[in-house]
């Protein structure tokens, strides 16, 4: 997924109220921008961090700049939760997700379950339906290990339950964890930060929900999926 224009480098001053951040551009200009990530962004909001911003001239936007990338421990990390579905679609089409590249049709944001929308719905005359829920992953505490979630997510647990219902109805259901950083080779569910989600993940797995993780290469020009990652069991990490 290529950005529509070159990203603007800056230095993070603070991120606050979930939706906002202050930064200093390279010419010394102080700006306030929007943050397209309402999660905790644990480990990615350190003042002084190098960041990259997209620019938007639309008169419908209150802020011209939007946060896209944060540098953490020398690694570029994509934080925009509005991008993973597009990146996942490219990854599936490129055959980077096990057994999902040969479906006839791919549709996004389709209604299903209990008044929910599935991120990607694959359909095929012979294979039937495959429901794909995409989660953005940017959290890493241990070298080489990406984790999700970085804070409690009731909505995420609900999605796992609904995916299990799709399996019970005779369809495939897949959790696709899109890791927007390239310094990790393994992925796990973070039981310590959300034990409820971890239990929901285990229940979904026993019901037949599949789980895959895909690594991304992040740059100020584009974010592209580069291939699958190992998914570890949801056991406590040793810090």
Swiss-Prot record:
NCBIfam families (alphabetical): sfsA
InterPro entries linked: SfsA, SfsA_C, SfsA_N
Record-linked CDD domains: SfsA-like_bacterial (cd22359)
A Pfam family recorded for this sequence: SfsA
Descriptive protein name: Sugar fermentation stimulation protein homolog
GO molecular function term, any single one: DNA binding
Family: Belongs to the SfsA family.
